[in-house]
């Protein structure tokens, strides 16, 4: 049994050195204060292996105790419970995190527990050999897969759709270069924000080059980079590179990293107040909601504000 209570000695009381006479105590419990974390265990568990703890509790080393009998060990107590489990059972389940394994190995080295040190070293080597990439970019294969990825993600989502097979016309002179720049910017952003944003590639959609931004499962904005122009007698597809707009929307989705707190009580309060509001207040509230809706709809326009492939809905 262990606790996390830090025991402070009484004013004027000083810890004292004493020899711990543990011979023949067997299953007697001792109380340990390891860096402020409190543990109870048996002398038998502490002396099963030839370690520094065995030297401490077999009388070969002096130990530091306070006036209440707690044996003080000046080490971090974070992993001491794991160390006790190893001393009792000769095996443990190691942490998954590499940093925590390193911390545990440092404590095992201090207490001279060679078996546990070997376990930690093997685990670290295995993790090194089976290294997983830090930045994974899913390529969606169906609309259902895309919906599931976005709905299940706890992070904001940035999706780049690029599909040259959707083009029916020839490209303008700079379109190939701009398409490549969009892809390069996507790669750059995914490396920069991979721990905070889920980046998705879509190569089966109906657009040629289009960015979509999601937060908390809903679509926030879209930047369509293509348009049809009449630069010559024939129609041509123009691909643009709205770099500043893409950066702006990417930074906007970072505002949705923290999940929203349910506000049912707030909704109830506002619904009650609205039912008692005057007609002028109702009109003002409707106007505010309408303004917000129009702002969001406007953000779905293309870079040059042409509604290519998207219907514009607004109120006059």
Swiss-Prot record:
Tell me where on the tree of life, at the top rank, the source sits: Eukaryota
Q: Which Pfam families match?
A: BTB_2 (PF02214)
> What is one process in the GO biological process aspect for this record?
cell migration
Q: What is its main location?
A: cytoplasm
Query: Example GO molecular function term?
Result: ubiquitin-protein transferase activity
Q: Does the keyword Nucleus apply?
A: yes
An example of a Gene Ontology cellular component annotation for this protein is: Cul3-RING ubiquitin ligase complex
Please state where this protein is localized.
Cytoplasm; Nucleus; Endosome
The chain residues annotated with the modification Phosphoserine are 278, 280
Q: Which UniProt keywords apply?
A: Cytoplasm, Endosome, Nucleus, Phosphoprotein, Ubl conjugation pathway
Please describe the post-translational modifications of this protein.
Answer: Phosphorylation at Ser-280 by CK2 facilitates the nucleus localization and increases interaction with PCNA.
Q: Which residues form the BTB domain?
A: 28-96
Its annotated pathway? Answer: Protein modification; protein ubiquitination
Which CDD domains is this protein grouped with?
BTB_POZ_TNFAIP1_BACURD2
Biological role: Substrate-specific adapter of a BCR (BTB-CUL3-RBX1) E3 ubiquitin-protein ligase complex involved in regulation of cytoskeleton structure. The BCR(TNFAIP1) E3 ubiquitin ligase complex mediates the ubiquitination of RHOA, leading to its degradation by the proteasome, thereby regulating the actin cytoskeleton and cell migration. Its interaction with RHOB may regulate apoptosis. May enhance the PCNA-dependent DNA polymerase delta activity.
Tell me which family the UniProt entry assigns to this protein.
Belongs to the BACURD family.
Q: How does it assemble?
A: Component of the BCR(TNFAIP1) E3 ubiquitin ligase complex, at least composed of CUL3, TNFAIP1/BACURD2 and RBX1. Interacts with RHOA; with a preference for RhoA-GDP. Interacts with RHOB. Interacts with PCNA. Interacts with CSNK2B.
Q: What is this protein called?
A: BTB/POZ domain-containing adapter for CUL3-mediated RhoA degradation protein 2
Source species: Pongo abelii
Name the gene that codes for it.
Answer: TNFAIP1
